[in-house]
Amino acid sequence: MSVSVMEAIKEVKLAEEQAVKEIEEAKNRAEQIKAEAIEEAKKLIAEAEEEAKKLVEEMIKKAEEEAKKEAEKILEETEKEIKEIISIAKVKILSLKLSEILEI
């Protein structure tokens, strides 16, 4: 009986050692998975930041283009109004000159 008890103790010890070894391997694998997940997350964050940067740049460019178009439109309208005012002023000046001539 002592031989089988000794064998049982050896088997238990071997099983315990194997379990400890498997636990350590599982811990190592978990650390590896964690490190890989962190690296993947860093890549995803960098990609998201790049996408956001591109989106913001596109939005800024679009806003600048719209502002430029609006400024050009305002400038055209202002120039048109200036021309109209000049035309009206010329007509009034000519009318005044004509009335002065008619008075003479």
UniProtKB/Swiss-Prot annotation:
<protein>
    <recommendedName>
        <fullName>A-type ATP synthase subunit H</fullName>
    </recommendedName>
</protein>
<dbReference type="Pfam" id="PF21585">
    <property type="entry name" value="A-ATP_synth_H_N"/>
</dbReference>
<keyword id="KW-0066">ATP synthesis</keyword>
<comment type="subunit">
    <text>Forms a boomerang-shaped homodimer with arms about 12.0 and 6.8 nm in length with 89% helical content. The N-terminus contacts subunit E. The C-terminus contacts subunit A. The A-type ATPase is composed of subunits A(3), B(3), C, D, E(1 or 2), F, H(2), I and K(x).</text>
</comment>
<keyword id="KW-0175">Coiled coil</keyword>
<comment type="similarity">
    <text>Belongs to the archaeal-ATPase H subunit family.</text>
</comment>
<comment type="function">
    <text>Component of the A-type ATP synthase that produces ATP from ADP in the presence of a proton gradient across the membrane.</text>
</comment>
<keyword id="KW-0406">Ion transport</keyword>
<dbReference type="GO" id="GO:0005886">
    <property type="term" value="C:plasma membrane"/>
</dbReference>
<keyword id="KW-1003">Cell membrane</keyword>
<feature type="coiled-coil region">
    <location>
        <begin position="54"/>
        <end position="104"/>
    </location>
</feature>
<keyword id="KW-0472">Membrane</keyword>
<dbReference type="InterPro" id="IPR049501">
    <property type="entry name" value="A-ATP_synth_H_N"/>
</dbReference>
<keyword id="KW-0813">Transport</keyword>
<dbReference type="InterPro" id="IPR014275">
    <property type="entry name" value="ATPase_A1A0-cplx_hsu"/>
</dbReference>
<keyword id="KW-0375">Hydrogen ion transport</keyword>
